[in-house]
Structure formats: structure tokens, C-alpha cells
């Protein structure tokens, strides 16, 4: 009887996937006794929030992700329905080492874990060069306590805490081959009761070399007497999600692939988190690597069969789930939410919007929102001791790409101190393209510049320059399908003229490409110059179509 029910559910799940519009009602009625008539489409967040971890506290869901060397670090997102999210804060405002006062691509905060324990929110994260850190807070929006170094180590990554029923605390983590010399191992340690110290040398609870190479990002849970570890394997681009279970926390652990790409277009469904709603439904949020767009987030239904999770839909009957493109929304008390990810900024507040991050630990003297009402003033500073190209600047203010296709418009007024000062709009990954306002004698000019392989210290190339009659200009970047970008400018905000050529945005080190604004000068120079930005407006294709 149970098998028959499961077969019927899967049958209607398949029908649901064929046409998420026409057959929605049929599928929903078959899949759930709840009167929900809403669906969602993946990705739920088309933005670079890699290595997500998610928890539920009451009716609220909270999500965190990797942030590497950007600051503030460890973004904290909030949702009431697992589909609509907004940023509410950051768990690590400044990274706790001076090396992060300058950009350190690919280093910093890797794969943090979020848990709620004893009335507090706990975040553990690994820095592959420094060790395992912990921060905690009473409120997920902050303030968060300063990072505590739990274990100084090299190559320890992706930590996740777990408190067992008897109160004993544990920490599981993976290994970075680039630092430790090996990977594909999951190691479990006992933790002190305050969560601040590792108490033993650790036990290898799973070796994935033969069956699940590059296993990493473990997340620890307990259900129905089993200890579960959810962990991706096989690599970011083409891997799969592995499920491990054991009746003993130290193992041995059985293993099973619980989510794979299969016949879908969702490559390498990677690291994520299992969540259970108040109604007892199980869901899984994971990332998909999408090149220049970074690691975008998907939401999958979870079905438990014989105490194994089946994530997504088993379309081919091989017992392994495949990602869904669309599905009915989770059965929660707030199926419809006004939450949306922050993007545009009119700079009318006394603080920057939470969507902004700097490329390194930031200094208050880099900017102000109070010098001119309704404007963000970026000062022409350059904290980098050496600056081969704009990629060396820590003081570029950036956002993640918010959608597959979007337009960014900003207006700046440039007030240089010397010919060395510059300000503008940039799209940056391992390569960058920028529109830069500069000053030469009595003339202002706007240039289009590109630079490739910025980490190798290459110089940028200026391919086109136009004169400006005044130091005020509107700048625009259009990002199209496939992250192909074009730039344009306007002197009146109405008529835009193209400048430069088509630019193919590319990913950075472990991150997607980003859009940003900047003001800078040459290294070591003291400048009193600045640029005032009136607004930063983003329009996605969905928003444009609604007009």
C-alpha cells in the first residue's frame, strides 16, 4: 500500500514537471492535502550565495553563505516561506586578520554552518589558511560577537557543529587539498560545552576516495535514531549530493547518492541544507554553479523512503532524486511573502544597503552618506601598497549579479584632486570592464577600460575615450543572457551612447562576477578628491516586463 502511494505521488510529480503552469492544480491536489495553489520556480535566488546553510526557528528561516575575503562577511538572509528571501545582516562584519585589509581572492570564509542552540544563533566557518572560527548572537540580524578561533589549523574547511541528545557537542569538517595535501575525508571531533575548543584529535567518519571523491561541505543532523550527514561530492560543476547515515555517531556510515543532475539542466547539484517546516515537510536548499553568475540557489522537495532522503524527483526510477524546475510552494503559515532581495540603492539612508560588500575589510574614511544628502560620497583613496589594476583595490563597493539579465544605472559627480584620481562603474571577476571618469588638465573624460587575469598583475587596456563638458555623467551597464555586458553613458539621463565593446563577464575565484562603483587614486597618494553617486538602480528583465 505504501509503495503504491509513493508510485502515485511520483506519477503526479512527473506530470507537474511537464508544465508548471497548465497542470499546476492537478499536481498540487495530488501532492498535498493542503489547499495551497501556489508554485515556485528554480532558482529561488539567482544570485551568488554559495555553500548555503539554512535553519528554521519557529516560523522563520535563516540562510547564510560563504563570503570569502569580502566584507562584511557571512550574509544572513531571512524568509518566511523558503522561497522569498531578504538580507538582514552579516555575521562577520570584519575578518579577524590584517591580511584581509586587501583583496585575497579565494581565501577567507569558506562554507559556514548555522545552528540555533540554547537560545543563541551559532555560526562556524573555516578559513583554510587560519583555522576554524565561531561567532554567535542572540538575534540573527546582529550584533554578532567577534570571531573566536576554535582551532588554529591549515586545510580545515566546512565545519558544522552538532549537539547530541545527551548534550555532547561535536564538530565535523572536511579538508582542502590545496592546503592539507589531501581531501575526500570527513573528520569528527568532540567540542567543549561552550563550543570554543576542540577536545580530541578527531575520528575519520567517512573516506570518500573510492566512491565519493572530493566529498566536502558536511551538514550534520539526527532523525528517527539515525545520524545523517548531507555532503556534496564529485566536484562543484558536475558532482552530486551524498547522504550518509549511521546509528552510531562515530560510524560506520552507509552512503547513498540522494540527488544528481540526471537528465536535468541543473549541473552538479551541490552543497546545501535540509530543512523541516512546522508542518513536518522536508526541503533542501542547494547551490548550482553558473559560471559568471556564481553559485545560485535551488529549493528541492524531500521525500523520506526507508529512512533515506530522496531529494527532488526520481524521474527515471533509479532511486536517486533529480532537481525540479518548478514545484508547489512549501506548506507554511506564510506562503506569500513581500520579502525580496535588496538591489537598488537611492543612498537616502544613513547606512549602506545590506546588498553591498567591499572587496576587503573596509575603513570608515572610504565613504560617507552624510556629506551631501541623498548621495553616497566615495573618496579617491588607494589603500593598496601596489596597484597593477583595479582588481588590487579593496575599496570597490560591489554587489552580486541579481539575475540572468539586468541593467544597472548610476549617476556620479566627479570632484578630483589631481589627474591621478578616477571614479566609475565596474563589472569585475577574474577579468573586469569599467567606465572611468578622469581629469586631464581642464578637461574631463570618460574611458572604457578592460583587464584580463587581474590576479596575475596585468595592466588594463583603455580602448575608447570620450570628452565630457562637465564632471557629471550617467553610467549604464547592461548584462544580458550568458553574462554578456555592454556599457553606455549619458549627459542628460535620457539619451545613452554606447562606449566600449561587448564584454564577457567571468567568474572570480570561487565567486561570481560582481557589479560595483569606485573612486581611487594612485597608491600612497593623499588625495582630497571624491565622487558623489546619486543612486544605483538595478532593473531585472522580470521587472522590465511588468511595466
Protein language model features and the residues they cover:
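Charged interaction patches that mediate protein-protein contacts
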Residues: 1, 21, 452-453
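N-terminal secretory signal peptides that target proteins for export/translocation
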Residues: 1-12
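Compositionally biased regions
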Residues: 5, 30-33
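Intrinsic structural disorder/low-complexity segments
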Residues: 9-10, 16, 32
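Bacterial N-terminal signal peptides
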Residues: 15-29
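Carbohydrate-active catalytic/glycan-binding domains of CAZyme proteins
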Residues: 33-547
Amino acid at each position: 500500500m505504501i509503495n503504491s502511494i509513493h508510485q502515485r505521488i511520483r506519477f503526479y510529480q512527473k506530470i507537474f514537471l511537464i508544465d508548471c503552469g497548465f497542470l499546476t492544480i492537478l499536481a498540487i491536489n495530488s501532492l498535498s492535502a493542503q489547499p495551497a495553489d501556489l508554485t515556485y520556480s528554480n532558482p529561488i535566488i539567482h544570485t551568488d550565495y554559495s555553500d548555503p546553510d539554512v535553519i528554521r526557528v519557529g516560523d522563520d528561516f535563516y540562510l547564510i553563505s560563504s563570503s570569502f575575503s569580502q566584507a562584511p562577511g557571512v550574509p544572513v538572509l531571512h524568509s518566511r516561506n523558503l522561497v522569498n528571501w531578504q538580507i538582514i545582516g552579516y555575521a562577520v562584519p570584519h575578518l579577524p586578520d590584517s591580511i584581509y585589509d586587501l583583496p585575497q581572492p579565494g581565501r577567507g570564509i569558506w562554507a559556514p554552518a548555522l545552528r540555533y542552540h540554547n537560545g543563541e544563533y551559532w555560526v562556524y566557518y573555516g578559513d583554510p589558511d587560519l583555522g576554524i572560527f565561531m561567532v554567535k548572537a542572540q538575534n540573527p540580524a546582529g550584533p554578532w560577537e567577534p570571531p573566536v578561533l576554535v582551532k588554529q589549523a591549515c586545510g580545515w574547511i566546512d565545519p558544522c557543529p552538532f549537539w547530541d541528545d545527551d548534550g555532547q557537542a561535536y564538530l565535523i569538517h572536511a579538508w582542502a587539498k590545496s592546503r592539507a595535501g589531501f581531501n575526500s575525508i570527513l573528520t569528527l571531533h568532540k567540542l567543549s560545552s561552550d563550543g570554543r575548543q576542540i577536545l580530541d584529535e578527531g575520528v575519520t567518519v567517512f573516506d570518500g576516495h573510492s566512491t565519493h571523491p572530493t566529498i566536502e561541505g558536511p551538514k550534520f543532523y539526527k532523525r528517527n535514531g539515525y545520524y545523517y550527514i548531507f555532503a556534496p561530492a564529485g566536484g562543484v560543476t558536475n558532482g552530486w549530493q551524498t547522504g550518509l547515515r549511521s546509528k552510531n555517531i562515530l560510524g560506520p556510515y552507509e552512503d547513498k547518492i540522494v540527488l544528481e543532475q540526471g537528465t536535468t539542466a541543473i549541473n552538479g547539484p551541490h552543497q546545501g541544507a535540509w530543512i523541516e517546516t512546522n508542518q513536518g515537510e522536508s526541503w533542501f536548499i542547494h547551490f548550482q554553479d553558473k559560471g559568471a553568475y556564481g553559485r545560485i540557489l535551488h529549493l528541492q522537495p524531500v521525500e523520506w523512503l526507508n529512512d533515506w532522503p530522496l531529494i527532488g524527483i526520481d524521474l527515471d526510477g533509479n532511486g536517486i532524486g533529480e532537481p525540479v524546475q518548478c514545484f508547489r510552494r512549501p506548506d507554511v503559515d506564510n506562503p506569500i511573502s513581500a520579502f525580496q532581495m535588496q538591489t537598488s540603492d537611492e543612498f537616502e539612508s544613513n547606512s549602506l544597503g545590506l546588498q553591498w560588500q567591499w572587496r576587503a575589510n573596509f575603513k570608515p574614511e572610504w565613504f560617507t552618506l552624510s556629506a551631501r544628502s541623498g548621495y553616497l560620497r566615495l573618496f579617491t583613496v588607494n589603500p593598496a601598497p601596489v596597484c597593477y589594476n583595479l582588481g588590487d583595490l579593496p575599496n570597490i563597493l560591489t554587489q552580486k549579479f541579481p539575475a540572468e539579465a539586468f541593467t544597472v544605472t548610476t549617476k556620479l559627480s566627479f570632484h578630483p584632486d589631481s589627474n591621478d584620481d578616477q571614479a566609475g562603474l565596474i563589472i569585475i571577476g577574474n577579468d573586469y570592464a569599467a567606465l572611468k571618469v578622469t581629469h586631464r588638465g581642464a578637461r574631463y573624460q570618460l574611458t572604457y577600460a578592460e583587464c584580463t587575469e587581474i590576479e596575475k598583475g596585468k595592466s588594463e587596456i583603455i580602448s575608447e575615450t570620450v570628452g565630457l563638458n562637465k564632471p557629471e555623467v550617467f553610467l549604464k551597464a547592461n548584462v544580458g543572457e550568458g553574462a554578456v555586458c555592454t556599457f553606455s553613458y549619458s549627459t542628460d539621463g535620457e539619451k545613452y551612447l554606447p562606449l566600449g565593446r561587448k564584454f564577457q563577464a567571468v567568474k572570480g575565484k570561487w565567486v561570481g562576477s560582481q557589479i560595483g562603483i569606485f573612486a581611487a587614486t594612485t597608491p600612497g597618494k593623499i588625495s582630497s578628491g571624491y565622487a558623489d553617486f546619486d543612486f544605483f538602480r538595478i532593473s531585472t528583465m522580470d521587472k522590465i516586463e511588468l511595466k
